[in-house]
Structures are given as structure tokens and as C-alpha cells.
Amino acid sequence: AITATIQKEQNLIIRHEDVPALLVAGIAGSGKTSVLLQRIAYLFYRNRGSLDPRHVFLISPNPVFAKYIENVLPDLGERNPETITYHDLCARLLPAGRNPQDKESPLELLWKIDRAVEGLRFELADLRDIKFYGVRLVSAGAIMQLMQKYPNVPAGPHLVTLVREELFNRLDARLKQMAATEAVQDELLCLSLDEQVRLFNAPYDPQTEQEARDCALTYLQERFSGAVLAIERDEWLRIDRIGMRLLGVENLPVSAWLYLNMAVTGLGNPDARYVMIDEVQDYTPDQLAVMARFFRRAHFMLLGDPHQA
């Protein structure tokens, strides 16, 4: 009878209706992990044809957990969702060299960010040059001029998206301009034969001026590929400086930095539909707030042991 009761309760969770947040509490060994995996399999089955594994994320406490469950869903006839740790998620989103391990951010600071960005106006000092290998490709002043093309668009994700697209065009024009210079042509002549073949699939031997420019552009696009990534990641925005100006806080904690970046740029995964967080009691409130904002359109399933909180 006890076993039947447990199975009945587990089935209720597995087949529970879609809700923004589903909290499952239980002590160690109570079957939470089994319920979690069966819930994922059930969601895939119920939404077959519309739900893809890339729409489902499992936030695990450590990489060992991912290894432990990697064969369970395939045995049930389903593919595995992406399984990551919170540390890995932060490492993907933070600038290079920034340690994901940091002091906790008070929730009040995150709510203050929500209020502060409503009145945000970008300043020149909030921007940085897009610069690689000592070459300034787009200046902070040029970025500010792009922003000023949209006087009726408030500072925030929409304006950042518009400027980001303008920056891609500006970078493309700058590289084409550089490709026509004699200095870049000289650089191509100094490439080793192996490098020429790798870049152009043949030794560098242009027959026309246009061919020479095309080869130069290919070379520059690879050389400055980091600039494309910097634009994509909105690294031309000085989030720390914006935070200091809006909040009066220097050296923002990781959670506050991420939250501010998401509020200003729209950073996030809007395609995620379900996010499962195991051992939820191990996360701080600010970490949960960051995940809720990053996966802003997703429904959450939270599993934890209140006795370990």
C-alpha cells in the first residue's frame, strides 16, 4: 500500500499540468531524480513534434550527475536535454578572465537594477572601442553616433539590438576598406605557403585586383573574427561602468553583473521551454533570479531537500 501511494504521488508529479514553477521536495533517496527524468520523458512524449532537446535544460549540481543520468532518457526512447552546471552557465556569459565564483548579490540589488535601467541613458564612457591586435576597428565615439540615430528608442535591449546590427555592417565596411590597402596585400605575401593554402585552398596568386581584394577580405575576416564575437556578446558596452553609475557599486558581484547585462542587452535564452534545477536548496536566491531572467520564457521544475537547506 505504501509503495502504491508513493507511485501514485510520483505519477501526479510526472504528469502534472504545465505551470510556471513546479517545486518537488523530498529527502535523499525519495526518488526525486527518477521523477525528474520521467517528467522530462513525459514532456517530450506529450509535446512530440514541437519540443526539441535544445528547448530543455537540466541544471545539475556537478558534472558527475550528468554522467550518471546520460543513458537513462535514451533507454526510455528520448534524447538527453542539455545538462550544465550553474558554474558552466556563468562561465559562458561572463567576460574572459572573470571568475564565476563570487560573493552573493543581495536580491535588493537585483531589484534596484530593474528600477534603474528604466531611466538609463547611455553615455560615451559606457562604451568601449572595438579593438583587436592594436587596430581600432570601430571607436566608442562611432558607436555613440550609431545610438544617436535612434533618439526615440530608450536605452535597453531594443536599442542594443539595433546598434549591434549597425556594428556588424560597420565592421564589414571597415574590413573591406582595409582589404584594399597595400599594407594588407603585403601581409598576404608574407604568409607561409601552408597558411595560403589553408586560407585560399591554393597558393596566393590573384589574377585580378578584385581577386586580390577578395583574398585580403577572407584573411581579415579570419584575423578579426574575435571582433564579430565581441559585437555578438555586446562587449562594446562597459557593464561595470554602467553598474557603477546606476547603482553606485564598484566591482559588481557576478550575479549583479549578469543581471544588469541581461537587463541592458536582452541577453538570455528565449527558446528554452523547460528548465529543471536539481538540488535547488544549494542555490542562493540571486543565482535563482539570474536563471529565471536568463530562461525568461521557460517553465521551471525545482527539486530539493528542505532538510539540507
Predicted regions and their residues:
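Hydrophobic anchor at the beta1->P-loop junction of P-loop NTPases
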Residues: 24-26
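Pre-Walker A adenine-sensing motif
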Residues: 4-16
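Pre-Walker A (Motif I) flank of P-loop NTPase domains
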Residues: 18-22
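Alpha-helical nucleic-acid-binding subdomain
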Residues: 44-275, 282-290, 298
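Conserved RecA-like helicase ATPase core segment
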Residues: 295-309
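Conserved lysine of the Walker
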Residues: 32-33
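Hydrophobic residues in beta-strands of the RecA-like P-loop NTPase core, especially within AAA+ ATPase
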Residues: 276-277, 304
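Catalytic acidic motif of RecA-like/P-loop NTPases
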Residues: 41, 281-284, 307-308
